[in-house]
Amino acid sequence: MATVQADSKITIVGSGLIGQFWAMIFAGGGFKVTIFDIYPEQISKALENIKATLSRYESQGCLRGSLSASEQAALVTGCNELKKCLDGASYVQECVPESVDLKRKVFEQMDPFITEDMVVATSSSCICVSQFVGNLSHKHRTLVAHPVNPPYFIPLVEIVPGPWTLPDVTAKCRALMELVGQSPVTLSREVAGFALNRIQYSIINECWNMYKDGLLSAEDIDKVMTDGLGPRYAFIGPLETMHLNADGIVDYCNRYAQGAYNVCTTFKPPPIMYDVPTAEKMLQEIKKAIPVDKVQERRTWRDERLAALAALKRNLKEKTD
């Protein structure tokens, strides 16, 4: 299987926040990165933000890779000519907003410049690649590589091949993600919402129903995750939890399957629509702790703690390796 070499060029299509994170991740791995945007001023803004963010991460001790912040920033350049950006690239990560029509337009523009040794991934969080590449001549070089926000501190990447994606393209994408320190999972085929959002939406569905039924306050619902499931799931997943909570997963099923089934029969059938009246009621509770005009401050708080958790997990892994 061919791999993306360390001296390869990587192109990011879209200069928004996710595109900037991808650029920093690849630069941290020592790759030369080119960011494409049709607006030069957006490119300049992105490059300035990347430089400042890398410098801040370095001062906070959470910079990834062996290169300094200035060395990593020097690896990232910008260009507003698509053909020039794609020329010589081994890997392309599209990061435009979540719109089928927009993604179709962008991929149609890229198609003439895609080569047979190039991997072209979309950062789509729910839209399958087959929904917008079906008419492309290079659709077999495309797939989903969905990051989790913020991807610099949450390493999971969902790799979802389309029905035409060549196996080597999928394998090459996964190898690259591992090389730059991400944690890829590969789905065998397309499914709506991929893996993470199918699990996440299942959780939100039940949280929404419990709140509407008056079972718990918004604060207590979040506490169930932050002080209950969350700490455990930060280190072991639900299947390993089953395995450890009995004498193996088979023993867990023998002991608890009927009880779990009985609980599940009380669930309201999905899907549900997250309705505005319920959201407005939730907001009255949530904004007491986090006013809407303080959301950005809370995001910064979140990222700082995710960075600390990432460092902790990395240190623990190094001790056990």
Give names to the regions the model predicted.
Residues I35, G78, T122:
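Conserved SAM-binding loop
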Residues A2-S8, G29-F31, L179-S188, D213-D321:
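NAD(P)-dependent Rossmann-like dehydrogenase/reductase catalytic/cofactor-binding core
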Residues M1-R56, Q60, F113:
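NAD(P)+-binding Rossmann beta1-loop-alpha1 motif at the extreme N-terminus of oxidoreductases
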Residues A121-R189, G193, N197:
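Rossmann-fold dinucleotide-binding core
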Residues T34, S183, L196, Q200-E206:
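Structural/interface elements that position substrates and couple domains in central-metabolism enzymes
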Residues V33, V92, V120-A121, T142:
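Hydrophobic/aromatic residues located in beta-strands of well-ordered beta-sheets
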Residues E41, R56-V119:
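Rossmann-like NAD(P)-binding element
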